[in-house]
Amino acid sequence: MKKLKASEIRQKYLDFFVEKGHMVEPSAPLVPIDDDTLLWINSGVATLKKYFDGRETPKKPRIVNSQKAIRTNDIENVGFTARHHTFFEMLGNFSIGDYFKQEAIEFAWEFLTSDKWMGMEPDKLYVTIHPEDMEAYNIWHKDIGLEESRIIRIEGNFWDIGEGPSGPNTEIFYDRGEAYGQDDPAEEMYPGGENERYLEVWNLVFSEFNHNKDHSYTPLPNKNIDTGMGLERMASVSQNVRTNYETDLFMPIMNEIEKVSGKQYLVNNEQDVAFKVIADHIRTIAFAISDGALPANEGRGYVLRRLLRRAVRFSQTLGINEPFMYKLVDIVADIMEPYYPNVKEKADFIKRVIKSEEERFHETLEDGLAILNELIKKAKATTNEINGKDAFKLYDTYGFPIELTEEIAVQAGLKVDMTTFESEMQQQRDRARQARQNSQSMQVQSEVLKNITSASTFVGYDTATAQTTLTHLIYNGEEVSQVEAGETVYFMLTETPFYAVSGGQVADTGIVYNDNFEIAVSEVTKAPNGQNLHKGVVQFGQVNVGATVSAEVNQNDRRDIQKNHSATHLLHAALKSVLGDHVNQAGSLVEADRLRFDFSHFGPMTNDEIDQVERLVNEEIWKGIDVNIQEMDIVSAKEMGAMALFGEKYGDVVRVVNMAPFSIELCGGIHVRNTSEIGLFKIVSESGTGAGVRRIEALTGKAAFLYLEDIQEKFNTMKSQLKVKSDNQVVDKLTQLQDEEKALLKQLEQRDKEITSLKMGNIEDQVEEINGYKVLVTEVDVPNAKAIRSTMDDFKSKLQDTIIILASNVDDKVSMVATVPKSLTNNVKAGDLIKQMAPIVGGKGGGRPDMAQGGGTQPENISKSLSFIKDYIKNL
């Protein structure tokens, strides 16, 4: 067998199947495009669902890809095994109703055994099949010539994830020899068993049945092939190394970790786990961020945050106690660059995000210790065991390692209820597994639409009307020849001016009619074979297939949609100009009355940034730039600087919407002929929609004017209420009122201080000596959170050499503040005091050594927290 680099295996695989007539499908972004059923792209076939379920027809029925993927259903196993990963590449060849078992098996055998390709020894290959799949057996045995002893029948060789395509599969195994798997159970020592000797290198799925809702199976009209070969695993076989982590995909990362930590890989098993966790997770994190995901507290962002925190935790076992993961990004970029240049292009941004997250997590670890200390106190007072649910919450919510929880508990003479902890973990795994199974199921093929292949030409770029012929009617899921008045119907036209919903732009509406009937068109979508599929209600008459009709788009709405779509392009370019090149479109909606644009960015825009973007767009509108639209090949388009939307798939010929030099973008939508037609652009809101995604909503033309007119009316009302005559006086009047309010609040604050002082009496008498320190620990009665700080300032001026800790209950919320004289901060730190107290009142806090503050939601525990902090100081 040849010893090949991973990049060579990938290229050979693609080249082989191109020779066999396959079309290369580029690797899609990890963040799914137009697929809400998936959190991540999690397999090679995930991006091809649209072809398998019949929604779209590919240019070629034979497809090959190398697809990056993320799976996080068993994160806790990564690092402890030889081949578990959260990020991996899946090589796959697919047939959509073209070749089937015979060719799929022959292709696989040729690629693996031919000296031109992988050059594997035929006598080291074994296969598994489903017991009832005699067709696969005969191909392997009679055509390939594989001995019967090397064909293993396994009941589990049937690919079925619920409703949708399913079928038997055959897996190919490579025998690595007796040196591997010596510690594995004898009963598992066979291809398909749990062992290290026989490694699965390829899985061929023969998708020939539909799994129906009633759990019956019916033959698919078009049989499909779906195969998967893990690149990391194949690299480990080709390079003859024990685990995936010793391949050239990982070893440069391991070498860098060795430099940073001073530890060696493959010397200590416990440390090796940390090496593998870090190496795996940094690949996932770097690629996910490069594809538009950002750390957050939910969804994809939560997965990233969890992975990063897990890697940081394990790095501490290597003695790394400072941010360093971000330094590995360049290594990942160099390894993957030949096929995935995106990580290198965005490396600076990725490093910035990761470093910020690392710094935050080092602070989180401190918070976790404070919570754990409370759990230890609670356990000592009750069962001498830390509750498993509490330990799981500490692990799952705060990212605190269960191993560290156990270690600290043992040192305190306690144990952790691991049975309950493991139960909680298993429930989480089950939820993730179920979600994965649900998300991977495909739709049942739509045969009615799929079988309609007659052409339907879109002519709406140049006109809003057309004389055309009605070619197909679909009613209640069946193709019919006529439909009566009042019914909802789907139909196709030989030529149509109606734009189908696509690229964020809504569909046109309008009417299709002749002397005998009229249909009000409400929706237009793309059929599987690319035709525009119209939906409408028959207003009067009887609709017949073959009728000659007039098709008219609602031109008022069309003009407004054009304005908003062209403005969206200008907005995208302006955002990149103001915020940076990391901005990518994450979604858009172009309607007649407004536009909405989602984009990747890691924080809210400032008012100044919003103003800059708005000004840039309007300047381009007022310049009156001609909008030139051309069709050209994709290479020429990119050479002229056309921006391709992130994650969008394009054909060989593309449509370029050119508003040069400001915006040049690939787009199939409808646009104005000159930017001056947009008239006016106004941003009305900027908000967050999720992890690292911001949303701008904006208006153009008449809608923008009416919006500003409404604001002007409200401004005039405010001017009247303030009793000023000119616009310029409004700000002065508001400033005057604010100054008067501040003066009144200051008077109230002083009065509150005086009242508090009277209530407290002589505070010097309340100072205690604890462990050699002068300490004032007390609850104060104040009207608001701000007042506790002013009270502290007052006390500090009188007790300059005293540690002061104050707590208050304001509206059932706890506020607390601590100060420590600077001369004492080497021994006592205000931040530590608050961190110890805050969890007791159900909150958190921190700050500097000399000043800190915090809060909580359990005012009933204020007395308990004050007593605790006295004991804490006593034991310093």
Swiss-Prot record:
Cofactor: Zn(2+)
GO cellular component, one term: cytosol
Record GO terms (molecular function): alanine-tRNA ligase activity; aminoacyl-tRNA deacylase activity; ATP binding; catalytic activity, acting on a protein; transferase activity; tRNA binding; zinc ion binding
Keywords: Aminoacyl-tRNA synthetase, ATP-binding, Cytoplasm, Ligase, Metal-binding, Nucleotide-binding, Protein biosynthesis, RNA-binding, tRNA-binding, Zinc
Known EC number: 6.1.1.7
Leading EC class: ligase
Subcellular location per the Swiss-Prot or TrEMBL entry: Cytoplasm
Main location: cytoplasm
CC cofactor note: Binds 1 zinc ion per subunit.
Amino acids binding Zn(2+): H565, H569, C667, H671
Database matches in InterPro entries: aa-tRNA-synth_II/BPL/LPL, Ala-tRNA-lgiase_IIc, Ala-tRNA-ligase_IIc_anticod-bd, Ala-tRNA-synth_IIc_core, Ala-tRNA-synth_IIc_N, Ala-tRNA_ligase, Ala_tRNA_ligase_euk/bac, DHHA1_dom
Annotated catalysed reactions: tRNA(Ala) + L-alanine + ATP = L-alanyl-tRNA(Ala) + AMP + diphosphate
GO biological process: one example: alanyl-tRNA aminoacylation
A Pfam family of this chain: tRNA-synt_2c
UniProt domain comment: Consists of three domains; the N-terminal catalytic domain, the editing domain and the C-terminal C-Ala domain. The editing domain removes incorrectly charged amino acids, while the C-Ala domain, along with tRNA(Ala), serves as a bridge to cooperatively bring together the editing and aminoacylation centers thus stimulating deacylation of misacylated tRNAs.
Family of this protein: Belongs to the class-II aminoacyl-tRNA synthetase family.
NCBIfam families: alaS
Protein purpose: Catalyzes the attachment of alanine to tRNA(Ala) in a two-step reaction: alanine is first activated by ATP to form Ala-AMP and then transferred to the acceptor end of tRNA(Ala). Also edits incorrectly charged Ser-tRNA(Ala) and Gly-tRNA(Ala) via its editing domain.
Protein's name according to its UniProt entry: Alanine--tRNA ligase
Phylogenetic lineage: Bacteria, Bacillati, Bacillota, Bacilli, Bacillales
Originating gene: alaS
